[in-house]
Amino acid sequence: LSTYDLLTKRIDLLSERVSKLMIANATANRKIAHLVEFAGFSLTAISDFSKYFKALQANIENYVIAIAVKDTPGLCFTDALYADMQRIGVTINLTKKHWYGYAAIIDGGNLLAENSAYQKVVTVKATTEDGIAVVATSKPLKVGNATAISFNGVGGSVCRRGINIMVYDKTKKCVCDSVCFDTHVKGIDCHR
Protein backbone atom coordinates (compact mmCIF):
# COMPACT_ATOMS: atom_id res chain seq x y z
CA LEU A 1 0.00 0.00 0.00
CA SER A 2 1.15 3.48 -0.77
CA THR A 3 1.52 6.21 1.83
CA TYR A 4 -1.57 7.87 0.34
CA ASP A 5 -3.62 4.67 0.77
CA LEU A 6 -2.41 4.24 4.35
CA LEU A 7 -3.26 7.84 5.22
CA THR A 8 -6.67 7.58 3.56
CA LYS A 9 -7.41 4.43 5.54
CA ARG A 10 -6.27 6.13 8.76
CA ILE A 11 -8.45 9.18 8.04
CA ASP A 12 -11.46 6.91 7.48
CA LEU A 13 -10.83 5.16 10.81
CA LEU A 14 -10.46 8.48 12.62
CA SER A 15 -13.62 9.83 10.96
CA GLU A 16 -15.53 6.78 12.18
CA ARG A 17 -14.19 7.32 15.72
CA VAL A 18 -15.19 11.00 15.63
CA SER A 19 -18.71 10.04 14.54
CA LYS A 20 -19.04 7.59 17.43
CA LEU A 21 -17.72 10.18 19.89
CA MET A 22 -20.18 12.77 18.58
CA ILE A 23 -23.07 10.36 19.16
CA ALA A 24 -21.81 9.53 22.66
CA ASN A 25 -21.37 13.23 23.39
CA ALA A 26 -24.92 14.03 22.24
CA THR A 27 -26.24 11.25 24.49
CA ALA A 28 -24.21 12.56 27.44
CA ASN A 29 -25.39 16.13 26.81
CA ARG A 30 -29.03 15.00 26.69
CA LYS A 31 -28.59 13.08 29.95
CA ILE A 32 -26.92 16.08 31.63
CA ALA A 33 -29.74 18.37 30.45
CA HIS A 34 -32.32 15.99 31.94
CA LEU A 35 -30.43 15.75 35.23
CA VAL A 36 -30.06 19.53 35.47
CA GLU A 37 -33.74 20.04 34.65
CA PHE A 38 -34.86 17.59 37.31
CA ALA A 39 -32.10 18.12 39.90
CA GLY A 40 -33.58 18.24 43.37
CA PHE A 41 -37.01 17.09 42.17
CA SER A 42 -38.60 13.97 43.51
CA LEU A 43 -41.03 12.17 41.26
CA THR A 44 -43.79 12.84 43.78
CA ALA A 45 -43.53 16.56 43.05
CA ILE A 46 -44.38 16.12 39.36
CA SER A 47 -48.03 16.07 38.26
CA ASP A 48 -47.62 16.75 34.52
CA PHE A 49 -47.69 13.59 32.36
CA SER A 50 -44.96 14.65 29.92
CA LYS A 51 -42.63 16.02 32.60
CA TYR A 52 -43.12 12.85 34.65
CA PHE A 53 -41.91 10.63 31.82
CA LYS A 54 -38.98 12.98 31.13
CA ALA A 55 -38.01 12.69 34.80
CA LEU A 56 -38.27 8.89 34.63
CA GLN A 57 -36.06 8.90 31.54
CA ALA A 58 -33.47 11.12 33.24
CA ASN A 59 -32.83 8.49 35.92
CA ILE A 60 -34.08 5.39 34.10
CA GLU A 61 -31.10 3.18 34.97
CA ASN A 62 -32.06 3.39 38.67
CA TYR A 63 -35.75 2.56 38.28
CA VAL A 64 -37.97 -0.47 37.93
CA ILE A 65 -41.27 0.81 36.54
CA ALA A 66 -44.58 -1.06 36.53
CA ILE A 67 -47.60 0.26 34.63
CA ALA A 68 -51.21 -0.96 34.69
CA VAL A 69 -54.37 0.58 33.24
CA LYS A 70 -57.59 0.69 35.25
CA ASP A 71 -60.93 1.05 33.41
CA THR A 72 -59.54 2.43 30.12
CA PRO A 73 -56.46 4.14 28.69
CA GLY A 74 -59.04 6.81 27.85
CA LEU A 75 -60.39 8.83 25.00
CA CYS A 76 -57.82 11.58 25.64
CA PHE A 77 -54.78 9.32 25.23
CA THR A 78 -52.88 10.68 22.21
CA ASP A 79 -49.86 9.89 20.07
CA ALA A 80 -48.01 12.65 21.95
CA LEU A 81 -48.64 10.83 25.26
CA TYR A 82 -47.46 7.62 23.63
CA ALA A 83 -44.25 9.39 22.55
CA ASP A 84 -43.74 10.40 26.20
CA MET A 85 -44.16 6.78 27.31
CA GLN A 86 -41.75 5.56 24.62
CA ARG A 87 -39.01 7.50 26.46
CA ILE A 88 -38.94 4.72 29.06
CA GLY A 89 -39.30 1.75 26.73
CA VAL A 90 -43.04 1.29 26.19
CA THR A 91 -43.81 -0.15 22.73
CA ILE A 92 -47.63 -0.46 22.64
CA ASN A 93 -49.52 2.67 21.56
CA LEU A 94 -52.72 3.09 23.60
CA THR A 95 -54.17 5.77 21.31
CA LYS A 96 -57.73 4.78 20.32
CA LYS A 97 -57.53 1.72 22.62
CA HIS A 98 -60.65 2.54 24.66
CA TRP A 99 -61.51 -0.32 27.09
CA TYR A 100 -58.16 -2.07 26.60
CA GLY A 101 -56.27 -3.60 29.46
CA TYR A 102 -52.55 -2.79 29.45
CA ALA A 103 -49.62 -3.66 31.69
CA ALA A 104 -45.84 -3.30 31.42
CA ILE A 105 -42.67 -3.81 33.46
CA ILE A 106 -39.47 -1.88 32.68
CA ASP A 107 -36.13 -2.38 34.43
CA GLY A 108 -33.48 0.28 33.87
CA GLY A 109 -34.96 1.16 30.48
CA ASN A 110 -35.23 -2.48 29.38
CA LEU A 111 -38.76 -3.65 28.65
CA LEU A 112 -39.18 -6.95 30.52
CA ALA A 113 -42.89 -7.53 29.85
CA GLU A 114 -45.73 -5.73 28.09
CA ASN A 115 -49.19 -6.75 26.93
CA SER A 116 -52.60 -5.33 26.07
CA ALA A 117 -55.97 -6.79 25.16
CA TYR A 118 -59.46 -5.50 24.42
CA GLN A 119 -61.80 -5.88 27.42
CA LYS A 120 -59.61 -8.57 28.98
CA VAL A 121 -57.64 -8.82 32.20
CA VAL A 122 -53.95 -8.40 31.42
CA THR A 123 -51.24 -9.57 33.82
CA VAL A 124 -47.48 -9.35 33.26
CA LYS A 125 -44.80 -10.77 35.54
CA ALA A 126 -41.03 -10.44 35.56
CA THR A 127 -38.03 -10.75 37.82
CA THR A 128 -35.41 -8.03 37.44
CA GLU A 129 -31.64 -8.59 37.27
CA ASP A 130 -31.55 -7.60 40.95
CA GLY A 131 -34.08 -10.32 41.81
CA ILE A 132 -37.11 -8.07 42.33
CA ALA A 133 -40.34 -9.93 41.52
CA VAL A 134 -42.76 -7.56 39.79
CA VAL A 135 -46.40 -8.20 38.89
CA ALA A 136 -48.74 -5.74 37.15
CA THR A 137 -52.42 -6.48 36.48
CA SER A 138 -54.84 -4.35 34.47
CA LYS A 139 -58.61 -4.83 34.52
CA PRO A 140 -60.75 -2.74 32.16
CA LEU A 141 -64.18 -1.51 33.29
CA LYS A 142 -66.27 -4.56 32.37
CA VAL A 143 -63.82 -7.20 33.67
CA GLY A 144 -63.03 -5.98 37.17
CA ASN A 145 -62.22 -2.26 36.89
CA ALA A 146 -59.02 -2.43 38.97
CA THR A 147 -55.23 -2.49 38.93
CA ALA A 148 -52.74 -4.35 41.06
CA ILE A 149 -49.01 -3.67 41.01
CA SER A 150 -46.52 -5.28 43.38
CA PHE A 151 -42.79 -5.40 44.00
CA ASN A 152 -41.70 -8.53 45.90
CA GLY A 153 -45.33 -9.11 46.89
CA VAL A 154 -45.91 -5.63 48.31
CA GLY A 155 -48.62 -3.69 46.44
CA GLY A 156 -49.49 -0.04 46.32
CA SER A 157 -51.17 0.94 43.07
CA VAL A 158 -53.28 4.10 43.25
CA CYS A 159 -55.95 2.07 41.43
CA ARG A 160 -57.78 4.93 39.73
CA ARG A 161 -59.00 5.28 36.16
CA GLY A 162 -56.18 5.64 33.64
CA ILE A 163 -52.45 4.94 33.64
CA ASN A 164 -51.32 3.69 37.07
CA ILE A 165 -47.56 3.68 37.64
CA MET A 166 -45.39 2.43 40.49
CA VAL A 167 -41.67 3.20 40.52
CA TYR A 168 -39.12 1.21 42.50
CA ASP A 169 -35.79 2.97 43.14
CA LYS A 170 -33.02 0.37 42.90
CA THR A 171 -30.53 2.60 44.75
CA LYS A 172 -32.86 3.11 47.73
CA LYS A 173 -34.36 -0.40 47.47
CA CYS A 174 -37.94 0.83 47.88
CA VAL A 175 -40.94 2.21 46.00
CA CYS A 176 -40.37 5.93 45.48
CA ASP A 177 -43.68 6.81 43.81
CA SER A 178 -47.14 5.52 42.99
CA VAL A 179 -49.21 7.70 40.69
CA CYS A 180 -52.16 7.61 38.31
CA PHE A 181 -52.72 9.81 35.28
CA ASP A 182 -56.36 9.93 34.17
CA THR A 183 -55.99 9.95 30.39
CA HIS A 184 -59.77 9.84 29.93
CA VAL A 185 -60.08 13.58 30.70
CA LYS A 186 -58.48 16.42 28.73
CA GLY A 187 -56.59 17.80 31.72
CA ILE A 188 -54.87 14.43 32.37
CA ASP A 189 -55.56 14.62 36.10
CA CYS A 190 -52.83 13.31 38.39
CA HIS A 191 -53.68 11.30 41.53
CA ARG A 192 -51.49 9.93 44.32
What is the predicted role of each segment?
Residues 1-2, 192:
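Accessible peptide chain termini
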Residues 11, 23, 34-192:
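Short acidic-hydrophobic catalytic motif
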